[in-house]
Every structure is written in C-alpha cells, then in structure tokens.
Amino acid sequence: MPHHEFECSKVIPERKKHAVIKGKGETLADALPQGYLNTIPGSISERGCAYCVAKHVIGTPMKDVIHISHGPVGCTYDTWQTKRYISDNDNFQLKYTYATDVKEKHIVFGAEKLLKQNIIEAFKRFPQIKRMTIYQTPCTALIGDDINAIAEEVMEEMPEVDIFVCNSPGFAGPSQSGGHHKINIAWINQKVGTVEPEITGDHVINYVGEYNIQGDQEVMVDYFKRMGIQVLSTFTGNLSYDGLRAMHRAHLNVLECARSAEYICNELRVRYGIPRLDIDGFGFKPLADSLRKYGMFFGIEDRRKAIIDEEVARWKPELDWYKERLMGKKVSVWPGGSKLWHWAHVIEEEMGLKVVSVYTKFGHQGDMEKGMPRCGEGTLAIDDPNELEGLEALEMLKPDIILTGKRPGEVAKKVRVPYLNAHAYHNGPYKGFEGWVRFARDIYNAIYSPIHQLSGIDITKDNAPEWGNGFRTRQMLSDGNLSDAVRNSETLAQYTGGYDSVSNVREREYPAFERKVG
C-alpha cells in the first residue's frame, strides 16, 4: 500500500497515513487510509462539527418545524440555507431559523431564561407551527444549560406544542459525523412511538437517510408509490415532525445514506424488529437493483419490472449521448461521506468517466471499505484533506472536473478546474433514472463550458487571443473526436426533461392496489 505524502504536509508526518494510492491487485486491507480520527493540529481541516451536521443535515429537512439553536448567532448562520432541502410546504424550514443569540453575559450568568423566552416568542411568531427542535451548541453545553428541562417546562405550559431536544454540541465527535449518531439516537429515544399512524397499504416502509436535496426524496417516493408501497416516514427529507414519530409501525426500513442514518435503522431493528434493506438511488443499475430488492421483499416484482422497463426505455438513450462525450474524462469524487462509494463505480460504468481520486471529510473506515474496492488502480484516496492538499492533488492528477462542496469547489475554480456541487447540487434532483441523466448533463456542461476559452486569457497583455477557427460552442468542443455514426445518431439525444421535474412528480396520480390485509 503506497501511502501518499503531500509536499505541503511533510511537516505533519501523521498525515501520511491518511492518503493512499491504490496499487495493482491490492487487497481491501492494503488500500485504506486511516479515517474518522481526531483532526491533527496544524492541518487546517475543512471538517464541520457535530452540531452542524445534527441541525444542518438531519434536522433542517423536517418541513413543519421551528429550528432554534441555543448559542451564538454565528452557529445558526453557518447552518442556514446552505443546502437545498426543498419541501412541499413552501420551504418553510429553509426560510426561517432561530438563534438565542447568546452573549458573554449569558455565559457568565446562564442562558436558560433566554432560551425559554425565545421558544415562546418563536411559537407566537408562527402560530400555525406547533413543533420545534432545539439544538445545543458548545458554549451553552459547557456552561451546563439544561435545555431538556426548559423544553419540558414549555410543553407543560403550552400543551399543544411538542419539542425535540438535540444535545449534539460541536465537540461531540472527531468530525461532524458525531452529530449523525447523536440526533439518530435522540430521536428514537424521545419521539419514536409517540404517535400512531394510519396504515393504508399492505407494504409499509420508512425511507431512511434521505433529505430531499432539490427533490431527491420526492423522486424516490414516486417509485415507491407507483409500486403500491406506503412511505410511512422519511428520515428526514420533506416529512412532518409527527410523521417521524410513527416510524415504529413500518414493515421495512429502506436505508439510503448509511453514514448519516444507519444508527436509527439499527435501533428500530433491535427495539421493534423492523428489518433493514440498503438501497442506492444513483445510477441506472444500482437503482434498478434496489427496486428489485424491495420488489422481492414484498412479492411485487411485476410492479417494479414495469417501472424499470418504462424508465430505462425513456432515459437510457439520453444517458448514452453524454457517455459518448464524457468517455475518458477524469473526475475527482470529493463529497462528504457515503457518496464516494455510491458514485465511484457507477460514474465510470454508466458515464464513461475515469475516477482518479476519492476523499471524505467525515467518513468512517466503513465508507472507505466500500469505496476503495469500487475504484481502479492508481486512485488517490484521502481522508480529511485540507485546502493545500486538495490543490496539490489537483496539480498532480489534473482532473477535468471535481464533484465536491462549495468550499473546495470554489478553490478549484481559481485554478481553472470546474466543479459540481455534490452536497446541494446545481440543477438536481440527481436521483432516479431521469435525475442520473440530469447529473450527466451537468457534468458535461461543466467540462465543456465555453467559458474555459476565456478564463485562460491573460488580460494584462495587449495581444488579442488567437481563436483559430473561432470561438467554439460546447458541442463543438465535445464532438470533435467522435465518429460520424455517434455524432449523427438518431437514437441518442441530449436531455429532454424540463427544468423542474419535481412539480410533475407532485401532480402525479397513483394506481390504487387492492389490499390483501384489512
């Protein structure tokens, strides 16, 4: 296993074991960087904190909730409106967020009275909202504010409201992934089993680890409904607070993002006997395999086959149009956690791209254990990289595009490497058959953007650029080396879907399947 030592990190020798280049024929154990350890002092990590992920990733997608952070306003601002967790209630949870705005005097004298005042004010400001989540931050955790007691006090005085308390201060784990565990366990301990749902079908699931980034959840739920499956709750995208309290009545937990939500799945299995089925909504083959899994589980294979046949016939020619033009282009897959193993292999197989690097900021060893076997020889894998290591990797690998978040992505743009936002998306949804074509389209648009012809011009020089055959369009750039048969194909086509695919899903009417059980 050739560990890779970055030049910029030679002064921090411990960093060497956090990056590896996968060699030929290496076993799984040989090709894993160390992961999910405390950040090494001096490495200037880009990780977030446990508070951030509890509120920002898992809590915020709940659509009918007032989200209030007990701490300084900076904590709240950093977790507000940075991901597109849309909902079908006019995106209430994205428009508003609350902070108790703790100051120095509250650190000295305590901030429990301030918290209670803010809770009551928030409910009065939005009388139609009766549910709230309170998030603990480091400073109020360190001074010992009892937010559980305050929540109980308010619920006694206002019996029509319900409050969930998330004790996940920023220091509650080596990275933001500590917050995944904290909020998972807190929710099942405090709220699951406190509401009894209406069961309307024979096949009932919880869709776990899906947060409806630009409509991903709604696309997947559409497939479930077309198969006659009742989605009791989604943890936590585009779902109501009370819906999540009824998770204990599902027949199956369908798990998407294992990194953020496997903990509640495991607890639901232990406490309520609900089995877990891991699925993947990214890519034609992984999605088709996932549909087969729960089709077989519920004995409704005929329904899933009809959906797969219809969707593949509709969208496969468009995916292949992009595959022909992306073939051999190099990509660095630099998301946060589980997307590195959701995407690495299927991007190569279905889009023709070559994955040259994967990294994770907060992933565990399990993420690398799943991801590295899906990568080819020579792939650079990095755990918890900093900005300088990222720039050095770009210089060494020279990818045509990176799939990452906004912070490393904007840095990459400065060195003329395009990126797609792997966290909040550019033009999602990216799940589903159509979504995967949208993803390929966005990758294509980024790589072949005509702007790159201008970005390389040195504007300090007086000489006009030599355009040769003139300014080239995106398709002129992508089609130059294609055969005439591919270029003029009558079966392949660019993406023909609309700008807003989610509205169509929301308007769909679903078949009524006869129930076998009363």
Swiss-Prot record:
Transmembrane segments: none annotated. Its EC number is 1.18.6.1. [8Fe-7S] cluster binds at residues 49, 75. Keywords: ATP-binding, Iron, Iron-sulfur, Metal-binding, Nitrogen fixation, Nucleotide-binding, Oxidoreductase. Binds 1 [8Fe-7S] cluster per heterodimer. It catalyses: N2 + 8 reduced [2Fe-2S]-[ferredoxin] + 16 ATP + 16 H2O = H2 + 8 oxidized [2Fe-2S]-[ferredoxin] + 2 NH4(+) + 16 ADP + 16 phosphate + 6 H(+). SUPFAM superfamilies: Helical backbone' metal receptor. The keyword Zinc does not apply. Its cofactor is [8Fe-7S] cluster; [8Fe-9S-C-homocitryl] cluster. [8Fe-9S-C-homocitryl] cluster binds at residues 257, 423. GO terms for biological process: nitrogen fixation. This iron-iron protein is part of the nitrogenase complex that catalyzes the key enzymatic reactions in nitrogen fixation. Other nitrogenase complexes utilize a molybdenum-iron protein or a vanadium-iron protein. This is Nitrogenase iron-iron protein alpha chain.
